Amino acid sequence: MSLFGKMFGSGGKGGKSASPQEAIQRLRETEEMLTKKQEFLEKKIEQELVTAKKNGTKNKRAALQALKRKKRYEKQLAQIDGTLSTIEFQREALENAHTNTEVIKNMGYAAKAMKAAHDNMDIDKVDELMQDIIEQQELAQEISDAISKPVGFGEEFDEDELLAELEELEQEELDKNLLEIGDNVPLPNVPSTSLPSRPAKKKEEEDEDDMKDLEAWAAN
């Protein structure tokens, strides 16, 4: 198949258009073919240059013919370089377009799937379901609280009466301790010796003071 056949296809106007993947693959094959053509022309140019140098002094006519062929090969090589640049640009643009198409397509699939998932959902039913869940959680908590409370098995007592009885017991214990302390503490013994008498000098001074007071009263 010719280069143009590979690039543009061999189908007629009514032929089916190629898919992006097929077009990208064809462009890559064309790039590979042109790259091989480049390598071939570069070798031919080197060969013609060697021939021209070899015959430069011996056979001028052969040298000129080699240079002419070299020029033609260089022209073809330049054309292929330009074509490769164009094909690379086209392939990259097509790959980007294909990527964007796939992304949009997948996003569309996801949107449809989400819509289908929500079609069977009613917001009122969802709210009702959540309310039921909350009520069941509250009921479960109440049951847990009831189970965790200590059970008296029918024995019920007045807590105030129990506290009053406890205070009486504490007071009785306190009084008992005080009595025990009083019985255990010994009283001081009565001194066996007489207390020292008041000094005589001091008693005489007091008597003199009394006499002075009596005389002063009589003088009045």
Swiss-Prot record:
Any single Gene Ontology cellular-component annotation: midbody
Any one GO biological process: vesicle budding from membrane
Region annotation Disordered: where it falls in the sequence: 1-22, 180-220
Annotated TM spans: none
Top-rank taxon, per record: Eukaryota
InterPro entries: Snf7_fam
Keywords assigned by UniProt, alphabetized: Coiled coil, Cytoplasm, Endosome, Membrane, Protein transport, Transport
Quaternary state and interactors: Probable core component of the endosomal sorting required for transport complex III (ESCRT-III). ESCRT-III components are thought to multimerize to form a flat lattice on the perimeter membrane of the endosome.
Function, as annotated: Probable core component of the endosomal sorting required for transport complex III (ESCRT-III) which is involved in multivesicular bodies (MVBs) formation and sorting of endosomal cargo proteins into MVBs. MVBs contain intraluminal vesicles (ILVs) that are generated by invagination and scission from the limiting membrane of the endosome and mostly are delivered to lysosomes enabling degradation of membrane proteins, such as stimulated growth factor receptors, lysosomal enzymes and lipids.
PANTHER family: CHARGED MULTIVESICULAR BODY PROTEIN (PTHR22761), CHARGED MULTIVESICULAR BODY PROTEIN 4C (PTHR22761:SF77)
Family designation: Belongs to the SNF7 family.
Name of protein: Charged multivesicular body protein 4b
Gene: chmp4b
